[in-house]
């Protein structure tokens, strides 16, 4: 494996870890700097996470398995560049809602 492929693979792995960590913690900081437990929304089944898409920030529940899809990873990189992952707005995907629906239906 070339060095370029290795470095790209490492960057993807780091990004996926950060997203999974963010999705799995879903807690809010308490005054002591730690996290307190917060119940997940009832409409988010185990193995899934919510994302917000488009200008209207429409909410979608997607399976964690999407994180391994290269096209979905591309959307996540765009989200990281535009919004970053360390904010309280939820994971926001900066793309047209129709495009997102088409992409996710192809992934499924």
Swiss-Prot record:
| Record's subcellular location | Cell membrane
Instruction: Output the superkingdom of the source species.
Output: Eukaryota
- Major localization class: membrane
The signal peptide annotation in the UniProt record is none
**Membrane topology of this protein:** Peripheral membrane protein
Summary of the tissues where the protein is detected: Expressed in seedlings, leaves and flowers.
Q: Name one Pfam family in it.
A: Auxin_inducible
Give an example GO biological process. Answer: response to auxin
Residues in coiled coil = none
* Keyword Metal-binding belongs to the record: no
Keywords (A to Z) from UniProt:
Cell membrane, Developmental protein, Growth regulation, Membrane
The reply on keyword Phosphoprotein is no
* Reported induction: Slightly induced by abscisic acid.
Cellular component (GO) terms are: plasma membrane
Q: Which InterPro entries match?
A: SAUR_fam
Q: Which family does it belong to?
A: Belongs to the ARG7 family.
What is the role of the protein in this entry? Answer: Provide a mechanistic link between auxin and plasma membrane H(+)-ATPases (PM H(+)-ATPases, e.g. AHA1 and AHA2), and triggers PM H(+)-ATPases activity by promoting phosphorylation of their C-terminal autoinhibitory domain as a result of PP2C-D subfamily of type 2C phosphatases inhibition, thus leading to the acidification of the apoplast and the facilitation of solutes and water uptake to drive cell expansion. Triggers plant growth probably by promoting cell elongation. Regulates branch angles and bending.
Q: What PANTHER family does the record tag this protein with?
A: SAUR-LIKE AUXIN-RESPONSIVE PROTEIN FAMILY-RELATED
Q: What is this protein called?
A: Protein SMALL AUXIN UP-REGULATED RNA 8
Q: Which organism is it from?
A: Arabidopsis thaliana (Mouse-ear cress)
- Supply the gene name: SAUR8
């Amino acid at each position: 494996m070339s060095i370029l492929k290795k470095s790209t693979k490492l960057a993807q792995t780091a990004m996926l870890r950060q997203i999974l960590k963010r999705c799995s913690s879903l807690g809010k900081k308490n005054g002591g700097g730690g996290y307190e437990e917060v119940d997940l929304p009832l409409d988010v089944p185990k193995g899934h996470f919510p994302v917000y898409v488009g200008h209207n920030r429409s909410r979608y529940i997607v399976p964690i398995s999407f994180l391994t899809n290269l096209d979905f990873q591309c959307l996540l990189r765009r989200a990281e560049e535009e919004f970053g992952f360390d904010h309280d707005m939820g994971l926001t995907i900066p793309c047209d809602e129709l495009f997102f629906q088409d992409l996710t239906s192809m992934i499924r």
